[in-house]
Swiss-Prot record:
This is Diaminopimelate epimerase. InterPro entries: DAP_epimerase_AS, DAP_epimerase_DapF. The active site is at residues 75, 219. The gene is dapF. GO terms for biological process: lysine biosynthetic process via diaminopimelate. It is found in: Cytoplasm. The keyword Isomerase applies. Belongs to the diaminopimelate epimerase family. One of its GO terms (molecular function) is diaminopimelate epimerase activity.
């Protein structure tokens, strides 16, 4: 059978989006791996699947597969593309949408200027919720990698993140240290590794090594986690502008227990069909 799909991106973080509300198919990890290959498939960082909700309190269910076939809890840039997609495809007329993910419920607000604001919910710092192995909760933790100790923050934005402060993201060892942090035994479900350079109280540069995808042009939940870690440790004040290789995101967070708001673009690239 042939399935219609849309290729989209949020700041260069690219996605294949499938409507499984009006189409019906059983998508497996092997399909994500096959289609995600940039040489022999469609090529993407993540596969986003739009499904009918399983409870009446939300509008849609949102599933995410990495290009390596692993299913993950959350994707912030993908959430913005999800919102744009369901409106463009007339799956809803609402501009404020409630969506269930493996990481919890998020709210998406499509603004008149085309930007999408995502209410990511409150960040979680309890180690067991991330999950991260630690004796007690702290703002930062020493993490030993190859005999060297790095001071990291650990945050869940519905998916696990580590945040390491660096002097300059351009020279940060993202490709050397990123995969080692991703697979560190203290992160039982692996982790997204962020490298943040604080420019001033409201601006920062960020690169992210994503779990199951490697370094991407942008990571929405990574930007949220980095902003939260920087605000919590007193390095920055909300609102925060995060510059990633693919572009800029605006992050707001009023403090513990409060939701993180992320605003940025969502762009449609092309439409296509793929054989299942």
């Amino acid at each position: 059978m042939l399935l219609r799909f849309t290729k989209m991106h949020g700041l260069g973080n690219d996605f294949m989006v499938l409507d499984l509300v009006s189409q019906h198919a059983h998508i497996q990890p092997k399909h994500a791996k096959q289609w995600g290959d940039r040489n022999t498939g469609i090529g993407f960082d993540q596969l986003l699947i739009v499904e009918a909700p399983s409870n009446p309190d939300v509008d849609f269910r949102y599933r995410i597969f990495n290009a390596d076939g692993s299913e993950v809890e959350q994707c912030g840039n993908g959430a913005r593309c999800f919102a744009r997609f369901v409106l463009d495809k007339r799956l809803t007329a609402k501009k404020r949408i409630r969506v269930e993910t493996k990481g919890g419920i998020i709210e998406l607000d499509v603004r008149n200027d085309g930007q999408v604001c995502v209410d990511m919910g409150p960040p979680r710092f309890v180690p067991a919720d991330i999950p991260f192995i630690a004796d007690e909760q702290a703002l930062s933790y020493p993490l030993e990698v190859d005999g060297q100790v790095h001071q990291i923050a650990a945050v869940s934005m519905g998916n696990p993140h580590s945040v390491l402060r660096v002097d300059d993201v351009r020279t940060a060892p993202v490709h050397e240290l990123g995969p080692k942090i991703e697979h560190h035994p203290r992160f039982p479900q692996r982790v997204n590794a962020g490298f943040i350079q604080v420019v001033d109280r409201h601006r920062a540069n960020l690169r992210v090594w994503e779990r199951g995808a490697g370094e991407t042009q942008a990571c929405g939940t990574g930007a949220c986690a980095a902003a939260v870690a920087a605000i919590a440790q007193g390095w920055m004040d909300s609102p925060v502008t995060i510059d990633l290789p693919g572009g800029r995101l605006s992050i707001e967070w009023a403090g513990p227990g409060k939701p993180v708001l992320m605003t940025g673009p969502a762009v449609r690239v092309f439409e296509g069909q793929v054989r299942l």
